[in-house]
């Protein structure tokens, strides 16, 4: 049996500049180290839309986004290998709320958003403010959205 562990981003939004896995690959008991460039373009998802990268190859969009994977003989070796992976990031400004994302000039996290299947002809019920019945309430609400 092999153990799989993921190296996850410490940043809410960052470009991945370089991932050096050489030390992790050299560790005895490590069978495979994968980065986003190994699986670039492969996506998965829990619902209808498979839109999340298996491993990020160009940027991370939330704290905990997966950057690398290690397969090793045991959990301790896998953890040690993760600590040997050197990732260089360029930290970018994050978008921390839906209100911030709706501001004019807000940072665009998904430049290909208009091509995303999930927003093609969204149902009217997707507008939470309409369903409240009183648009005056909308200014007083905070929305908490949990990460994927």
Language-model regions: role of each:
Residues 1-140, 146-148:
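Flexible, low-hydrophobicity surface segments
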């Amino acid at each position: 049996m092999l153990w799989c562990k993921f190296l996850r981003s410490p940043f809410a939004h960052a470009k991945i500049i370089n991932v050096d896995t050489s030390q992790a690959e050299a560790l005895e008991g490590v069978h495979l180290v994968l980065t986003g460039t190994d699986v670039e373009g492969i996506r998965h998802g829990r619902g209808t839309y498979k839109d999340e990268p298996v491993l990020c190859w160009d940027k991370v969009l939330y704290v905990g986004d997966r950057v690398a994977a290690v397969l090793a003989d045991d959990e301790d070796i896998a953890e040690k290998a993760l600590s040997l992976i050197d990732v260089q990031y360029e930290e970018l400004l994050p978008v921390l709320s839906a209100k911030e994302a709706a501001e004019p000039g807000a940072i665009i996290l998904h430049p290909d958003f208009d091509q995303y299947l999930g927003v093609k002809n969204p149902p009217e019920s997707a507008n939470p403010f309409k369903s409240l019945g009183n648009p005056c309430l909308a200014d007083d609400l905070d929305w908490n959205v949990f990460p994927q």
